[in-house]
Curated annotation (Swiss-Prot):
Protein's UniProt name: Gene 54 protein
Signal peptide: none
Top-level taxonomy: Viruses, Duplodnaviria, Heunggongvirae, Uroviricota, Caudoviricetes
GO function terms (MF aspect): hydrolase activity
One Pfam family of this chain: Metallophos
Gene name of this polypeptide: 54
UniProt superkingdom: Viruses
Amino acid sequence: MSKRIVVISDTQIPFDDRKQLKAVIGYIGDTQPDEVVHIGDLMDYPSPSRWTKGTKEEFAQRIKPDSEQCKRRFLEPLRQVYDGPVGVHEGNHDRRPVDYLHQFAPALVEYVSSFQFQNLLDFDGFGVDVLPEFYKIAPGWISTHGHRGGVRVTQKSADTAYNAMMRFGTSVIIGHTHRQGIKPHTLGYGGNQKVLWSMEVGNLMNMKLAQYLKGATANWQSGFALLTVDGQHVKPELVPIVGGRFSVDGRVWEV
């Protein structure tokens, strides 16, 4: 039998698009995939960001409240409808509290576990795993958030994942860019071929809440991704959210 994996990315709670996130959780509950992977930047954690250093936001004391929002809007609703395996990559935003501690309070680093996102969000209590930086998500495929491994980030959809694919020599699925795109590349000689695939998942963030855009519209696409696995066969598929709807296998979900 085939296996289906749902991959979501860059919710950046509390700046998530709440309607989109709720609809995707509803889809997961309706279809019961074999695995759910959040590919990183589950959280935003703006207070310890380098961009807010020295501003009022740095003193907002919102790490705990934001973590509670994640529990209420993502982890609790997800576990109410789905009891299968859930794994989360640590994105660059997810580790902002830890990075802040290392940089500005090194005397307290022995307490670093208290600032790790898996503990702030009680992953153990929700039965959620922290995935390795490079996760063998399917035969011939790895998933990673996309901010590490020497990957060159570009502004065109799928090109960052393509750079990762060529660097790693395997099919790759990433988040980080907030863009959606799929791009293959064929290698071989003498008519023999090996096709590698690269995919960027998109995001479930509310762009209007991204203050660092300063009112601009970024080249981001809302949606998520699917991997359908049957033995060594892996089909990558993007699910864009457009006009308040998305569709999978001929069925439409409203946002």
